[in-house]
């Protein structure tokens, strides 16, 4: 009986170790293979918040066709780094079109993000690469999503899965992000790991 319990314990330990390893791999993949889009409004005034969304739409649309052809996060980051002056020009021109004279700063950087829930998927907390666009003084509310892969474009979960899979995300991670039944614990652990990562990153 004792030997049986020992064997069962060893089997459970192996299974748990494998499962934990896949969760850690998912956390690393999220941090390395997603590029978030972070647009910061000049203020919380209604018009500044509207301008933030106009800039978001203009920048997203200007990059969409090129980013859809990219299947590697490293290539996407290099592309965005090279395009920073162009992105700034798109954002600046959008503001000018609507009569706003605010300046715009654009950068590709590492940022701390809280857990976010979108229409078709959720992202756990953690440190991510981000295309950061700051309008004016940058004192207003933020808009966060994902610029690569284009997870914020599809209107349905099936679209989200297809886009994520095209970027090389494994099925388990896709199911975790769209909230498939049975993956809640996995998402919770990813979120907890991300929050811990945020604490150390902020030190």
Predicted feature residues:
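Soluble extracytoplasmic domains of inner/organellar membrane proteins
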Residues: 120-183
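Sec-exported extracytoplasmic/periplasmic mature domains
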Residues: 56, 60-68, 85, 89-96, ...
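Short extracytoplasmic
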Residues: 32, 36-69
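Aromatic-capped interface at the extracytoplasmic side
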Residues: 19-33
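Mid-length scaffold segments of soluble, non-membrane domains
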Residues: 77-146
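Internal, well-folded beta-alpha domain core
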Residues: 69-79
């Amino acid at each position: 009986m004792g030997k049986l319990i020992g064997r069962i314990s060893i089997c459970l330990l192996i299974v748990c170790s494998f499962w934990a390893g896949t969760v850690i791999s998912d956390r690393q993949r999220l941090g390395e293979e997603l590029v978030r889009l972070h647009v910061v409004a000049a203020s919380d005034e209604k018009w500044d918040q509207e301008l933030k969304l106009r800039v978001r739409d203009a920048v997203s649309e200007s990059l969409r066709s090129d980013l859809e052809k990219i299947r590697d996060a490293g290539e996407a980051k290099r592309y965005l780094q090279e395009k920073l002056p162009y992105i700034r020009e798109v954002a600046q021109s959008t503001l000018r079109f609507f009569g706003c004279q605010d300046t715009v700063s654009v950068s590709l950087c590492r940022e701390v993000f809280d857990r976010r829930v979108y229409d078709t998927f959720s992202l756990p907390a953690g440190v991510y690469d981000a295309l950061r666009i700051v309008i004016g003084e940058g004192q207003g509310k933020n808009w966060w999503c994902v610029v690569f892969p284009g997870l914020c474009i599809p209107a349905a979960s099936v679209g989200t899965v297809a886009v994520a899979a095209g970027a090389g995300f494994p099925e388990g991670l896709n199911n975790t992000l769209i909230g498939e039944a049975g993956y809640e614990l996995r998402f919770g652990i990813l979120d907890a790991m991300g929050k811990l990562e945020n604490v150390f990153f902020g030190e």
